Amino acid sequence: MVQEEINKTLVEHSRFGNVVRLKGGDPFIFGRGGEEIIALIENNIDYEIVPGISSCYSAAEYCGIPVTHRGVATSFHVITGHEKVGNETVNYSALAKLSGTLVFLMGLSSAENISNKLIENGKSENTPVAVISSGTTPRQKCVTGTLTNLSALAKQMT
């Protein structure tokens, strides 16, 4: 279902009483929850948000990988790995300079581009990486390697 249909469904069903909209993870971290809130506000519909735990760190935790670690990574940065074609805005030059953990969400199909752009902008080819698919579910897969073989690791997930 496309987002516009989801928004319309929320508005239509709310006219009949309480509606619960369940989303995996945090609805405001690349979850399009903001768009749903706007649709509700525009239709004068009251709502309540109960945020979930975001996959931007929970998937790594399930693999035993901390996104921050004293002396290693004192910050983490969440980036979409799934930009609209022709509307790319990720600043790989700035990302390559960061010393914290880079978390790309929904980036399996873009892994080769992500790897190439980071390396082209100065990130070490030996930077450790993990590729996680279906995080925090019974189907979760996690493989690790380096930035050089990120694309090959991602292909193991498909």
For each feature predicted by the language model, list its residue ranges.
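A cross-family phosphate/adenosyl-ligand binding-site feature
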Residues: M1-V11
